[in-house]
Every structure is written in structure tokens, then in C-alpha cells.
């Protein structure tokens, strides 16, 4: 299909603040904000334009509506485990994004003279192509990004000078 093929962006969203739950409420309170574009649009768009499109899907009314739809599907399903918040995901093409950048983990002090953390990372990834995690911001405002790529995609991305100008491979 080439540049007309549609790519979906799934953005994990903590729905607690949208539905009035306490931020420490136990349980899985995650839904996905969904955005899509053709590959041609993605390739020709500026990063800021794509980011704005994704952020628009984080609007309160949209999150509440989509979460209510998901809750209704779960409620009506005979097998609650069969309900999938990414039902049409094609991991070879689509992107799943989760951001922990707002969490102030580097401000935490472990006490006992240990001080603040040197690094904050997500536990080992489940290998799922197209999965992206933005880690908590460091004290200087940097953000570590975890990407799950195929080996051949990784080999290509590290050879891309324009990409590597903005990042450093650490693992």
C-alpha cells in the first residue's frame, strides 16, 4: 500500500484524573488514546504537528468517552479477559506509546545517605515491536526513551545522522 497505508498511534493514558479517581487508587486504570495518519502524512509532517495531533486525542471529553465505551465493552463481555484496548494493533506498523516523563522520580531521596536515583528505568520490556516508553525526566530535563525495534530497524536508525544528532544509544 505504500504511503497511503494507515499507521495507528496508541497512547496509554492513566484515566484516574479524568474519571475522578484518586491518583493512588489501586487497579488498572489505563486506556488508549488513538490517532492515525497515512504513512505519507507521517513522513511529510513536522514532528510538532504529529505531536499536536496525538495531544489532541488526550482531551478530557475524548478520554472520558473512550473510557466509558471500553468499560461498557468489558461489562457486556462474557469473557472479560477477551476485551483488548488495542484490538487492531499491527505491531510491525503501528506505534504504542507510554509516557512516564511527568513522574518526578529523580526528586525522590532513598534516605540512609543514598540520595537521589542516578537512573530510573522500566523493568524489562515484553518484546513487542513498535513499543515506546518515555522515562521520567532527569533533573536536567533530559528524557530517556525506550524503543522496541527489530534488529534491522535498529541497525538503520543508528546510521541515520539526523536521528543520532538528538540521541545517544545506551543499551
Model-flagged regions — what are they?
Residues 1-171:
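Acyl-CoA-dependent O-acyltransferases
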